[in-house]
């Protein structure tokens, strides 16, 4: 990957889904927010996932099975358009912004095994966790937005989350200018390394607590 991360040319992506397991989740809403200079183009698509949306998921994003069935596009159509837009963004030279990329991108891979990461990804979750290792508190998008004074209205609405993630990415580059000095390849490798190290530490913590939970060490798509 050539070039560097340009915060003025981003494609920010977020999914709301039927569940927390990326291997089984179906898309409910998909948002892609294209930012180029002062121009912004928002696309949010509602999908009919073809299955019941669990009440726990509806409680998070507010979309019920009935609403998705009545108003949503066919699931495979939303999936295909999402992947097409991401690939187009990379072809146009944009960096893909995904907060906690290992969830959203792993969902795409599980739903379409042909999906691959062919362009640069910037994950504010991973970067913030590395650059502010000792900050206490949760690393949810809401908490990180509060730390960087980024407004987040309608949390867990895909488009709102995508916009907020892009704003956090921009704030990170202002606070840590070395992020835009790295080449795209260097930034991808750095994030992969930071994620791996963080997950190894998390696994060690689980073991210390006597818990048998296993964690994923791969970024930006879980193995």
Description of each model-found segment:
Residues 1-28, 34-41, 66-223:
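DEDD superfamily 3′-5′ metal-dependent exonuclease/proofreading module
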């Amino acid at each position: 990957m050539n070039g560097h991360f340009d915060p003025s040319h981003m494609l920010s992506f977020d999914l709301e889904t039927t569940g927390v397991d990326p291997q089984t989740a179906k898309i409910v809403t998909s948002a892609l927010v294209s930012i180029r200079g002062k121009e912004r183009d928002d696309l949010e698509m509602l999908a009919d996932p073809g299955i019941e949306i669990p009440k726990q998921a509806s409680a998070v994003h507010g979309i019920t099975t009935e609403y998705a069935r009545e108003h949503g596009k066919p699931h495979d159509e939303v999936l295909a358009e999402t992947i097409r837009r991401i690939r187009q963004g990379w072809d146009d030279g944009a960096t893909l912004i995904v907060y906690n990329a290992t969830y959203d991108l792993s969902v795409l891979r599980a739903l379409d095994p042909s999906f691959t990461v062919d362009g640069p990804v910037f994950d504010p979750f991973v970067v913030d966790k590395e650059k502010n290792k000792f900050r206490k508190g949760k690393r949810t998008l809401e908490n990180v937005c509060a730390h960087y004074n980024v407004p987040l209205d309608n949390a867990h609405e895909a488009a709102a989350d995508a916009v907020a993630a892009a704003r956090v990415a921009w704030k990170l580059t202002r606070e840590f200018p070395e992020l835009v000095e790295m080449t795209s390849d260097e930034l991808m490798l750095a994030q992969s390394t930071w994620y791996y190290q963080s997950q190894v530490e998390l696994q060690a913590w689980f073991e210390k607590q006597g818990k048998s939970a296993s964690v994923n060490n791969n970024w930006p798509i879980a193995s």
